Amino acid sequence: TSLTVSGVQIDPTAVTPADIVGAVTADGVESGMEVIRQIFPKLNMTPGILLAPGWSENALVSAGLQAKTSHINGVFNCVCIVDIDSSTAGATKYDDVKRQKEKQAVTSANCYAVWLYAKVGDVIYAGSAMAAAATEATDANNGDIPNVSPDNKPISISAACLKDGTEVLLDQEQANVVNSFGVATWLNMNGFRLWGNNTACYPGNTDPKDRWFSVRRFFCWDDNTFIQTYFQKVSDPLNKRLI
């Protein structure tokens, strides 16, 4: 007995940064990141984290993600997680991260930048994908309230690596240097963990409400929740209780 299976496999190499960023045609057809606008009207849900694993190390894509975190549908905000390029054209050493971050123009308070990919066995994952999963798992363990940072939370990976799979061994001192650039990374301290709580606006902006990833995420969530909760009061007469 034999079984033959056929199908069509999507070729990810055919996707370009321009496809990810997207556009609005003259006929009003939206594509790429422009579709983010459709999330709330279609699902009545607000975006929480924007990411484009495998593409966000491109400056055009990372700029687009940062821009799309603010004023979604004119009122909502969220965060994005981007990768700092760790290919041969990017940062292959920890002290190159600052230069590469600046090259990609990653500076938003709503952006969490991650340097290094992650290995699980022989499979390589973009750092942004793993960081987003760790962030959502942290939220789930906290009643879906995003006030706890994913920083220093254990994650089940077997190695930190460059984009080509070359393993990178960072100690805490080196990982802290990466953090000082406003970039998170992976640290093996009795098991791998996400290491870094600064948003990409750091060190240029040290305001706690902008600098700390957990604070930035909570403010976005709280603002979005407030808007949805009290939208029903729009056009109602003002009274002391409502104030």
Language-model regions: role of each:
Residues 1-97:
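Small-residue-rich
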